[in-house]
């Protein structure tokens, strides 16, 4: 650990700063962090065995998380902002045909509630429309699957990144266009974001 500024000379630099899950920006997400709010179904799903959970998102990741959680929970609500899923056709079919998953299209999560942890989510259906509807849905767990932000901001003036911020490497190699600089793990991996692939 370096306190303050220090210049270090090295023959190579490996950037492995990871990626951080995106949140909705609700104050309640911080309040219930570790008490019902999670951004990793494979990490925390087992806490919700035979319980009711909600997953926020409409892409492949959200659908995968919903299917995974459906193997543990008694009920999974998939909260989708749009009137359709953005996931691949096969993932859409898995979700829509799963008896434990209910998709709530055109819904926005606007808050969470509970005394000692998450006990429910406040929803708005068809936000801003004449038939807008607000209601509360009892749940035990709230999972976010709306993407990740790579922790690459401090390198953007020196290293090429894609439009999201993932560091661009040379194909399957960790090499960047800057000689001696490599990127490993989630900061350069927009697809898998798992410890096993980050370590590989």
Where are these regions (language model features)?
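A Rossmann-like FAD-binding core segment of flavoenzymes
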Residues: 1, 7-8, 15, 71-171
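FAD-site-proximal beta/loop scaffold in flavoenzymes
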Residues: 20, 25, 30-47, 145-193
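An active-site-proximal "capping" alpha-helix that borders the catalytic cofactor pocket
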Residues: 196-200
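Glycine-rich Rossmann-fold phosphate-binding loop(s) that bind the pyrophosphate
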Residues: 57-59
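N-terminal Rossmann-fold NAD(P) dinucleotide-binding loop
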Residues: 62-63
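Phosphate-coordination loops involved in phosphoryl transfer and adenosine-cofactor binding
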Residues: 49-51, 106, 178
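Generic hydrophobic/aromatic pocket-lining and core-packing "Φ" positions
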Residues: 66-67
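Nucleotide donor/acceptor-binding cores
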Residues: 12, 35, 50-52
């Amino acid at each position: 650990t370096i306190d303050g500024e220090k210049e270090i000379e090295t023959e190579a630099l490996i950037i492995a700063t990871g990626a951080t899950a995106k949140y909705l920006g609700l104050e309640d997400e911080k309040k219930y962090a570790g008490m019902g709010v999670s951004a990793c179904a494979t990490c925390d799903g087992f806490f919700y065995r035979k319980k009711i959970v909600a997953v926020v998102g409409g892409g492949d990741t959200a659908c995968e998380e919903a299917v995974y959680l459906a193997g543990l929970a008694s009920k999974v609500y998939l909260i989708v902002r749009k009137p359709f899923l953005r996931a691949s056709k096969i993932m859409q079919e898995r979700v829509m045909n799963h008896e434990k998953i209910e998709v709530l299209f055109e819904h926005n999560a606007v808050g969470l509630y509970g005394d000692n942890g998450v006990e429910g989510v406040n929803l708005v259906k068809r936000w801003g429309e004449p038939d807008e509807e607000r209601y509360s849905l009892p749940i035990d767990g709230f999972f976010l699957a709306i993407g990740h932000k790579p922790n690459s901001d401090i390198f953007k003036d020196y290293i090429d990144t894609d439009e999201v911020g993932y560091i661009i490497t040379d194909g399957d190699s960790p090499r960047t266009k800057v000689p001696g600089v490599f990127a490993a793990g989630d900061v350069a991996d927009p697809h898998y974001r798992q410890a096993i692939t980050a370590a590989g």
